[in-house]
Amino acid sequence: MNDRFERLLKSRIGLDASSVGSAVIERAVRQRMSGLALHDEDEYWMRLNGSPGEVQALIEAVVVPETWFFRYPESFTTLARLAFERLPSLGGGRALRILSLPCSTGEEPYSIVMALLDAGLSEYLFEVDALDVSARVIERASLGVYGRNSFRGDELGFRDRHFSEVAEGYQLAEQVRRKVRFRCGNLLDPGLLAGEAPYDFVFCRNLLIYFDRPTQSEVVEVLKRLLRPDGAMFIGPAEASLLSQHGMQPIGVPLSFVFRRTSEAPRGARPKAVSDGARPVVAAAVERASIRPSPPPPAKPRQRLSSLVPPASGQPLASPVGEFDEIARLADAGQHREARAACERQLAARGPSATVFYWLGLLSDVAGQEQEAQDFYRKALYLEPQHAEALAHLAALLAARGDHAGARRLQQRAARGVNKDG
């Protein structure tokens, strides 16, 4: 297959063919040709050039969504904190505006809504827009019906609160669905959301790694245009260095991958804890939109906290959950050195642990120590080959370094594990 199809996808959606592999694009072309009963590439090429609808169909055959609810859970905890911090300054004049793109089949924007509702924020005080280049996934997202693969990790209390079991899987509650406005959109479109006010928070995670360098720079500038000057952007863990090159820097909340413009984010700045008095101020500002009493914050999902490898002595061990909570507390407080020390104590006391190596990988990732992070993720995967988050983080790091073949192998490995489990 000649590379004209790759060039077309590059021009339309910015896709760097090496990030997914030429075989993926060729398979999508063959799939579309078969669907149209065409046997000649030149004939299909003519059809593409004369049919915007067929271009969209090819894009949808190439873009295969891989997402789940509350991926990178610390991001959603941080979003809730930042939202409560920001609301009093709005004085009830408008709702918080949040953008998710690409939204894929809806797990991310719906997670945003559930996180804010569960944190105690009234549904009248925020609005969520969700964009994707694929009309097909937008249609699926609007239905709000999900299978088991969309629910990963051990903490699934949100599913009990916001979903009902149906024959097809799990149906999302109408209260959550109605808060998201879905639409098709292309980040390379110069007029994208031109008539919309900028957003307080923008989620664009694990997309930039699929672009070449010039397209990455172009897309970052589009995202900055969509973001308020004092807004916050949530990205994927492997994309931090790119944003740092474009006048953005992390706000200092570990494992959340949140950035602001440099002028808005003094080094080491962290969102202030929400005071007890902040919520009544917000409630008074918006008639009928009082904030309901906040339930205790849901526990953060952690990957397989009980999957420890016992030491050689084989002596029974006490439950390590409290010690892992201590690591999480230190990391969330920005005490990285102390969190690392706690991990080292765990390794010395209990022997190799996939969870501890995963935590060390995250801490290295956040610190920008990419090679060290890779080493720790690989150690976690040696002990637990299907550790979903270690696979996802390592794949993102490899893709960011240009090792797209290695990233694809890890993504395929993760998909095999999910299909086996679900």
UniProtKB/Swiss-Prot annotation:
EC supergroup of this enzyme: transferase
UniProt protein name: Probable biofilm formation methyltransferase WspC
Region annotation Disordered: where it falls in the sequence: 289-316
PANTHER family: CHEMOTAXIS PROTEIN METHYLTRANSFERASE
Domain CheR-type methyltransferase stretches: 1-264
Alphabetized UniProt keyword annotations: Methyltransferase, S-adenosyl-L-methionine, TPR repeat, Transferase
Cited function: Involved in biofilm formation.
Binding site for S-adenosyl-L-methionine: 67, 71, 108, 132, 186-187, 205-206
SUPFAM superfamilies to which the protein is assigned, alphabetical: S-adenosyl-L-methionine-dependent methyltransferases, TPR-like
Gene: wspC
Record EC number: 2.1.1.-
Protein species of origin: Pseudomonas aeruginosa (strain ATCC 15692 / DSM 22644 / CIP 104116 / JCM 14847 / LMG 12228 / 1C / PRS 101 / PAO1)
Molecular function, one GO term: protein methyltransferase activity
Source species taxonomy: Bacteria, Pseudomonadati, Pseudomonadota, Gammaproteobacteria, Pseudomonadales
Any Gene Ontology CC annotation: methyl accepting chemotaxis protein complex
Record's subunit section: Monomer.
GO-annotated biological processes: chemotaxis; methylation
TPR repeat ranges, renumbered to this chain: 354-387
UniProt xrefs under InterPro entries: Bact_Chemotaxis_MeTrfase, CheR_C, CheR_MeTrfase, SAM-dependent_MTases_sf, TPR-like_helical_dom_sf, TPR_rpt
